[in-house]
Amino acid sequence: MANLDKYTETFKMGSNSTSTAEIYCNVTNVKFQYSLYATTYILIFIPGLLANSAALWVLCRFISKKNKAIIFMINLSVADLAHVLSLPLRIYYYISHHWPFQRALCLLCFYLKYLNMYASICFLTCISLQRCFFLLKPFRARDWKRRYDVGISAAIWIVVGTACLPFPILRSTDLNNNKSCFADLGYKQMNAVALVGMITVAELAGFVIPVIIIAWCTWKTTISLRQPPMAFQGISERQKALRMVFMCAAVFFICFTPYHINFIFYTMVKETIISSCPVVRIALYFHPFCLCLASLCCLLDPILYYFMASEFRDQLSRHGSSVTRSRLMSKESGSSMIG
């Protein structure tokens, strides 16, 4: 730690996005992250935009009120679409290494990333919990009102929207420098108590509690398959519930678990609380991959809707069939005119 102090002056003269520990361990620039981010976001943007736009259109227009998870699916799609719409600006920056817009727009895009992540976590958890609860308590499902889901969704947006504000606030240093954004934003130094409190809240509310809930739902749904079916509830209904809960769990663990495991170490490295060079290197090199995996939820969630709601599949099939028929008819009419 004594040697680490020698680099303090260098750190003060250097980039705000670089911590003292990074300079000490000679990991001042993870160069591959720019091409990784740009490539990932390019691959996600078009499919994510088309899939989530189509999903939102089908969910809002065609899915019946009988589908209890519809409200949570719509909100999940909105969260994904908000992040996807910000990807062109991220792609431009990571390719050009220059931010020509206002700093406020940069921080808004940065904020939308974390809003998407934690809103997605909450809505995936709600879908799993609701599906499991209605499977175990089918009579309660009959009395459940859609306005309850609307109220829960509104509360989630308010709480998550407020809770995500520290992310752009902590990165809003050096406001006069409008040329850098996203991965190159600086970090505000925090005292250890405030930092530990922020990490604890983020990990507990944004990861640990949802993991416990989703794991419990998966366990209870699996057990229900071994029990005799209740009135008006066949084995197929339980299998559909299990498939839904399993898919929510899969999206959650693939997209969000790596980030939250690395988040603790990465934040402590940036705040110069951890100075062990092996830990510094692992946290910094792993971080870009974690963020890319988190953005992958924008592609996986529409697949979730497809397998969760039979009406969703039916509407896509009907729309695809109608498009095919219209094309065939136009070709036939064109051929008859030529003939």
From Swiss-Prot:
Recorded GO CC terms: plasma membrane
Disulfide bridge partners, by residue number: 106-181
Pfam families, sorted: 7tm_1 (PF00001)
Subcellular location: Cell membrane
Glycosylated residue positions: 16, 26, 178
Protein topology in the membrane: Multi-pass membrane protein
Keywords assigned by UniProt, alphabetized: Cell membrane, Disulfide bond, G-protein coupled receptor, Glycoprotein, Membrane, Receptor, Transducer, Transmembrane, Transmembrane helix
GO biological-process terms attached to the record: G protein-coupled receptor signaling pathway
Protein family membership: Belongs to the G-protein coupled receptor 1 family.
Name under which the protein is recorded: Putative P2Y purinoceptor 10
